[in-house]
């Protein structure tokens, strides 16, 4: 308030109270319209509210556009997420199938290893049996008899001890005596002996000196 109080004048005590109060009358008080000040604002220029309103409208429109863009992005993300979920499910099924196939292969390998091991054991056993069978034969080929003499010397000694039979050429064949007589001419001819008719007299089937 710009009104100033008037300093009281010095009066004598003889004056009455009413006269003193009239002298001390204050100046009239000025009043302001606060409603108008609230609407216009104490520090705003004329026409400033319209600019603010326009700016607010622009900001709201931009916010709406951004919200729509965000909504579209969200829809795309939801679709992509659904696709990702489907892809994950497919991958899980494929992994499950691969695990089952791997189990089957492992079982097949385990089952195939046992026959192979059995076959190897059988081969080793057969080799050992063959070695045990061939060793005595090799020893017999190398040594003969209790004295341990070589087999070749033993054969020579036996050949010397056995008497020679003059009819040995006739017994070279395993068939009958007649066939042996038929075989002898060629052998005798090769050895420089008599021809076939010289031996014909020994044949029981011969009716004459020659056939």
UniProtKB/Swiss-Prot annotation:
InterPro entries: Tex35. The lineage of its organism: Eukaryota, Metazoa, Chordata, Craniata, Vertebrata. Residues 47-111 form a coiled coil. Keywords: Coiled coil. It comes from Bos taurus (Bovine). It comes from the Eukaryota. Pfam families: Tsc35. This is Testis-expressed protein 35. GO terms for cellular component: nucleus. Signal peptide: none annotated.
